[in-house]
A protein has these predicted regions:
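Soluble secreted/lumenal catalytic domains
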Residues: 23, 202-204, 235
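Short glycine/serine/threonine-rich phosphate/pyrophosphate-binding segments
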Residues: 13-17, 90-91, 191, 216
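Single conserved hydrophobic/aromatic residue that forms the stacking wall/gate
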Residues: 238-250
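Short, structured active-site "lid" loops
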Residues: 45-58
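Short gly/pro/ser/thr-enriched loop/turn and capping motifs at secondary-structure boundaries
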Residues: 36-38, 114-118, 213-216
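N-terminal signal-anchor module of multipass membrane proteins
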Residues: 5-25, 52
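Cap/lid and interdomain-hinge subdomains that line or gate substrate/regulatory clefts
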Residues: 1-3, 27, 31, 44, ...
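Short, flexible loop segments at boundaries between secondary-structure elements
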Residues: 210-234
Length: 250
């Protein structure tokens, strides 16, 4: 039974999110492209690499809207829009496509990945202690990130309202504003606290974030799986990003 659909905009993102579930022994499948047979899926978690990272905002919107529509028609309840932890790609267009097509009122978005020092404070996204626009991602040769304030970045591509909120305390009510709700997180504990608040009244239909928050979903969603899994020991990666190279060296 499909418990969760994850929409990632590139192959790396699909894998680094899918592994959060596979590592817990949860049946996980990764597919590439927008032609997906949801009825034929036999995994608990389906990760779709939509290949929309480098498309125009309009084309990316269309792909996410199509997949959202088809997934809901097939009975998929929960959808997670996986975003880049450095805020690259068509984030505003894709979040708005998911929200508008679903008919839901709000979409909680937790962009932080504190496990690798990417955090959100007072609505501003930081990479290794500096605003993302001042990090290497701000001078990316293909997709420089132009806004560190997450709501401003979202607003570049959509008219859907976006609001910034501090970390939710466990038991705290989810804000009632309709639109995209961006939550701060400076630690894994912050992500977990907001996650528990979001799940307090049941499983959300829509969620968004990077692999950081996705790592908490197996427990938040109470997904069945084996907790001890043998993983391969060899990793081969080619990447132009200096932060990625330094992570591998360390």
């Amino acid at each position: 039974m499909l418990l969760l659909l994850i929409l990632a905009d590139d192959f790396t993102g699909a894998l680094d999110t899918g592994v959060q579930f596979a590592a817990c022994g949860i049946p996980t499948r990764v597919v590439v492209g927008e032609q997906v047979d949801f009825a034929a899926n036999d995994a608990a978690v389906l990760v779709v690499d939509t290949e929309t990272r480098h498309l125009s905002a309009a084309k990316a919107y269309a792909v996410i809207a199509k997949l959202t529509r088809e997934a809901m028609s097939a009975g998929v309840f929960s959808i997670y829009k996986k975003t880049d932890s450095a805020l690259r790609g068509n984030i505003g267009a894709e979040l708005s496509a998911l929200l508008k097509t679903s008919g839901e009122r709000r979409l909680p978005f937790l962009p932080a990945f504190p496990q690798i020092d990417r955090v959100t404070r007072d609505g501003v996204h930081y990479i290794s202690g500096v605003p993302v626009t001042e990090s290497p991602f701000g001078i990316d040769p293909f997709e420089p990130v132009r806004h560190a304030r997450v709501t401003e970045l979202i607003g570049e591509q959509t008219d859907v309202p976006a609001y910034s909120f501090p970390t939710l305390k466990e038991g705290e009510a989810v804000p009632e504003q309709e639109g995209i709700l961006v939550f701060d997180a400076g630690s894994l504990g912050d992500l977990a606290s907001t996650g528990r608040a979001l799940f307090r009244n049941g499983r959300p239909r829509l969620m968004a974030g990077c692999a950081g928050f996705a790592a908490l979903l197996p427990d938040l969603m109470k997904m069945p799986g084996r907790r001890t899994v043998t993983m391969p020991k060899l990793l081969s990666l080619i990447h132009i990003s200096e932060p990625t190279r330094l992570q591998l060296i360390s």
